[in-house]
């Protein structure tokens, strides 16, 4: 009898709505909010960009957030188990999402290590008067990828990389409430306070108004350019942690009576509010350095790694109390990256734990230690930066966008949206209906355009001048391998104690 009707293990839960919201915001607010949004806004019409950005948030970001919440909460499992309980044919999407998180986790840790190192460097001034030369030549000791992959390890990179892995795995081993929720409940308020102080400080720097003018002056002509709208949808999609298993996993830890849509609205608008705050702080600081150097903002404005590790050290060198500015900026970057990194690894831990039914401590070790070693081998060397660049590009477009597009098409084609909508409406304050379903369908089209247009561009032009063998192996090869491994994992049997179906009226 015990084998015919196995009793499922009791799933961990967040203590309440506040704990979940802070953890979800912690996942969503990451590197992209601080170093991607400001420059994306500046490049795509300034103040005018806010219009497509808000439309993207309301028609894609929040609807997809609701969808992820419904899948995870209704089916009470990590991504693979939730999709398996949704439909046996959908299980592969969950494993595909898990594999995307494996790749992201491998390289996200190294950027987290960089940010932590630069928090310390803010006080020592290690980068001197030439931050670019220091970052490329002394910190990364960057080699030429055209000469092949290097296995020459860089101590300044590997030591903080390993340290960040140990911190994250320590948090994850403590569980959902005692680990993830507690850390998020501390780091997120601290992050907001630190960044508010940074913004206020930046606004009082000479030339701050010049930077804000550059950021917010609208170029309305940009709104007729389709690439601007795609940039808006891309920013929302990549910054909200939607479509690749994180929010499915976190929602599965909610108690059965939870306000899903209300929480989703809070998370969605909190994430966007932080992005706007980041834009103000970053461009006020860029206005200062442009004024100090007698340049235009366009000459100093950068995004991504260039903003964080080239532009900001220069700003810190020239700003009054620059050490404080550096601590606030790189400390914020570290905290934001850490909570996002934890959420990425949790997707993998949850998936494996559901599959083989062993303790959280054991599965954290089984997942974490091999990933840490691979992370060090790939990104702790002199060719770590080009490896990171290619991994990030391909896993975003041909991992995240690809699996989101495929899973949405499957859900819509199999007429499952109504089922998820009903689940959302059972416990939520904000009800969904036809408009929500329409947004999901239309978002599928946007994702298809993003996927195929970017695929055609990279296929015909290559990527950033990297050698074909490198892009084909670690770009296209990696992307294809994610789906291949996902198909293999979906064929493996589940542990007999794993309950693969749910009560359609009550859930697990």
From Swiss-Prot:
Keywords: Cell membrane, Membrane, Symport, Transmembrane, Transmembrane helix, Transport. The keyword Transmembrane helix applies. One of its GO terms (cellular component) is plasma membrane. The chain crosses the membrane at residues 19-39, 47-67, 92-112, 153-173, 186-206, 228-248, 272-292, 325-345, 365-385, 394-414, 432-452, 469-489. Putative sodium-dependent transporter. Belongs to the sodium:neurotransmitter symporter (SNF) (TC 2.A.22) family. This is Uncharacterized sodium-dependent transporter HI_0736.
